């Protein structure tokens, strides 16, 4: 028997190694180095949103009521963007605008920048969490790569778009009805639905939903009998460790339905990853274009002909008129700081008015 005589290998751990051991320890909820970014930012972002929707008015920024305290409900409450006069100020609590006054900070819209910036870093922290966990259990990082899609959309809509405009005022406020208002704004002022990047985004998201439904149904349809007898919900109580569904049967079925079918599971699942993530990225790229006020398709020849010929109209020209109506109504209501006043005869009227 050989006895090794020498210095003990157990040296005292440094601060970094001790922190690494604690952060990456196996526990019910993994923390990790990414958790140092994720958990505080997510906590502050959600806390700011709950605080704002419960107590904080938008009277000073938008001339609106936006909190439960003022009578709003879950669908109409929001954390509103700062006033347009504040441009792209970070609105730090200790900054020159609020000067440490918390009430004044809330009135100025400071909670919006607080929620938006902490929310963006929380999403980035969540993506890093997926990278970190994948590395620790020796998985490839496709989950984290896929999550780049939602991050790209959030950053482009809530941060890049208002940075390209005159201020945070033109970003979406954080609320359900507020997001609907923002969608109408995008349509009226940017003709967003005719933008090819929006079309690619819709194709990606709805296509992914279709793929998900088809894939789930096909796997359920081709589950192997596992000896327990027929059970519609066999997926919930599997008793076999090996592969549970037949790719060959699924391939045969869809070959007969469409004439083509996936023959490789890896290609099938990569396609299910590729379609929604690409759609989200295309939407994000389109919103960056809108930040720079790039136009969607303009079919000027149809507009000119419609102006000259009362009998000529297309769905495009009708939509252009609808957009003009949105702008006429929205500009005065949505941008009170501009003091816009339109003559009554130029405003579209509905039956209720």
From Swiss-Prot:
It holds the Pfam family Photo_RC. It is found in: Plastid, Chloroplast thylakoid membrane. GO terms for molecular function: chlorophyll binding; electron transporter, transferring electrons within the cyclic electron transport pathway of photosynthesis activity; iron ion binding; oxygen evolving activity. Its EC number is 1.10.3.9. The modification Phosphothreonine is found at residue 2. GO terms for biological process: photosynthetic electron transport in photosystem II. It is an enzyme of class 1 (oxidoreductase). The chain crosses the membrane at residues 41-61, 125-141, 153-166, 208-228, 279-295. Coiled coil: none annotated. A plastoquinone binds at residues 215, 262. It is a multi-pass membrane protein. Fe cation binds at residues 215, 269. Chlorophyll a ChlzD2 binds at residue 118. The keyword Iron applies. The modification N-acetylthreonine is found at residue 2. Keywords: Acetylation, Chlorophyll, Chloroplast, Chromophore, Electron transport, Iron, Magnesium, Membrane, Metal-binding, Oxidoreductase, Phosphoprotein, Photosynthesis, Photosystem II, Plastid, Thylakoid, Transmembrane, Transmembrane helix, Transport. The D1/D2 heterodimer binds P680, chlorophylls that are the primary electron donor of PSII, and subsequent electron acceptors. It shares a non-heme iron and each subunit binds pheophytin, quinone, additional chlorophylls, carotenoids and lipids. There is also a Cl(-1) ion associated with D1 and D2, which is required for oxygen evolution. The PSII complex binds additional chlorophylls, carotenoids and specific lipids. The keyword Lyase does not apply. Pheophytin a binds at residues 130, 143. Chlorophyll a PD2 binds at residue 198. Belongs to the reaction center PufL/M/PsbA/D family. PSII is composed of 1 copy each of membrane proteins PsbA, PsbB, PsbC, PsbD, PsbE, PsbF, PsbH, PsbI, PsbJ, PsbK, PsbL, PsbM, PsbT, PsbX, PsbY, PsbZ, Psb30/Ycf12, at least 3 peripheral proteins of the oxygen-evolving complex and a large number of cofactors. It forms dimeric complexes. Photosystem II (PSII) is a light-driven water:plastoquinone oxidoreductase that uses light energy to abstract electrons from H(2)O, generating O(2) and a proton gradient subsequently used for ATP formation. It consists of a core antenna complex that captures photons, and an electron transfer chain that converts photonic excitation into a charge separation. The D1/D2 (PsbA/PsbD) reaction center heterodimer binds P680, the primary electron donor of PSII as well as several subsequent electron acceptors. D2 is needed for assembly of a stable PSII complex. 2 of the reaction center chlorophylls (ChlD1 and ChlD2) are entirely coordinated by water. This is Photosystem II D2 protein. It comes from Physcomitrium patens.
């Amino acid at each position: 028997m050989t006895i090794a005589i020498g210095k003990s290998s157990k040296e005292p751990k440094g601060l970094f190694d001790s922190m690494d051991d604690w952060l990456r320890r196996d526990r019910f909820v993994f923390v990790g180095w990414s958790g140092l970014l994720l958990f505080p930012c997510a906590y502050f972002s959600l806390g700011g949103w709950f605080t704002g929707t419960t107590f904080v008015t938008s009277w000073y920024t938008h001339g609106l009521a936006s909190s439960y305290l003022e009578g709003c409900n879950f669908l109409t409450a929001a954390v509103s963007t700062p006033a347009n006069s504040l441009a792209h100020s970070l609105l730090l609590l200790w900054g020159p605008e609020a000067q440490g006054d918390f009430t004044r900070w809330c009135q100025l819209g400071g909670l919006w920048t607080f929620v938006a910036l902490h929310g963006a870093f929380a999403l980035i922290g969540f993506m890093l969490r997926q990278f970190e966990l994948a590395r620790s259990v020796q998985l490839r990082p496709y989950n984290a790569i896929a999550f780049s899609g939602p991050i790209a959309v959030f950053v482009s809509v809530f941060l890049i778009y208002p940075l390209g405009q005159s201020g945070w005022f033109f970003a979406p406020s954080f609320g359900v009805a507020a997001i609907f208002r923002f969608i109408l704004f995008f349509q009226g002022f940017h003709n967003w639905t005719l933008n090819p990047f929006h079309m690619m985004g819709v194709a990606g998201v709805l296509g992914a939903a279709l793929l998900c439904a088809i894939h789930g149904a096909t796997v359920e349809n081709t589950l192997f009998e596992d000896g327990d007898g027929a059970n519609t919900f066999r997926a919930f109580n599997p008793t076999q460790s090996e592969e549970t569904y037949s790719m060959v049967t699924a391939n045969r079925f869809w070959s007969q339905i469409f004439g083509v079918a996936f023959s490789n599971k890896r290609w099938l699942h990569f396609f299910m990853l590729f379609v929604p993530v690409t759609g989200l990225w295309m939407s994000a790229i389109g919103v960056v274009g809108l930040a720079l006020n790039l136009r969607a398709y303009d079919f000027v020849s149809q507009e000119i002909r419609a102006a000259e010929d009362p009998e000529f109209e297309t769905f495009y020209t009708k939509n252009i008129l609808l957009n003009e109506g949105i702008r006429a109504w929205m500009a005065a209501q949505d941008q009170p700081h501009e003091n816009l006043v339109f003559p009554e005869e130029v405003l579209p009227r509905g039956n209720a008015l």
